[in-house]
Amino acid sequence: MKAVAISLSALGDMEPLWRDWLDDARRRYRVDGDALDQELPNWRELLERFAEERAPVYFRRDADVSSTLRQLRASGTRIGVFTDAPAELARVALSHLGAERHIEVLESGPGAQKRILAALGEGARVIDTREELLAVT
């Protein structure tokens, strides 16, 4: 296998942290979560700070996942990660999950899976769940 495109949700669940930040932003800044770019232009920096402060509560490293990522990397497999979540949140999550050093390419936001497959080239295997990831090796 030359390359894998792993959904970030296979490595860890970012949804609770994202939801909590949106709730906090709505309360603190009185903004609509669907209109962040218009109502809160620096929302990405605020999200990153919020995520960095709270990441240890939300993310735990998984020894089996870490071992699989190490094995893939050692075998020469290119590893890419994709997510619909904002890049700022994805980078913090990867760092706290201990996966950042194994990842060659990260794509985030709408269309991330399509972009990661283009970056990794033909034949990249898509992995959507932790179970699929652990079954790769």
Name each model-derived stretch.
Residues P16-D20, A63, V92, T137:
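Generic recognition of short, well-ordered alpha-helical segments
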Residues M1, R70-R73, A87, R91-T137:
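Asp-based, Mg2+/Mn2+-dependent phosphohydrolase catalytic module
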Residues M1-E39:
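Active-site neighborhood of HAD-like aspartate-dependent phosphohydrolases
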Residues T83-A85:
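Conserved phosphate-coupling serine/threonine residues in phosphotransfer and NTP-handling enzymes
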Residues V31, G76-R78, H102-I103:
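A generic structural motif
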Residues N42-E52:
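Short, basic/glycine-rich phosphate-binding loops at helix/coil junctions
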Residues E52-V81, R91:
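Short, acidic loop-to-helix structural element flanking the phosphoryl-transfer center
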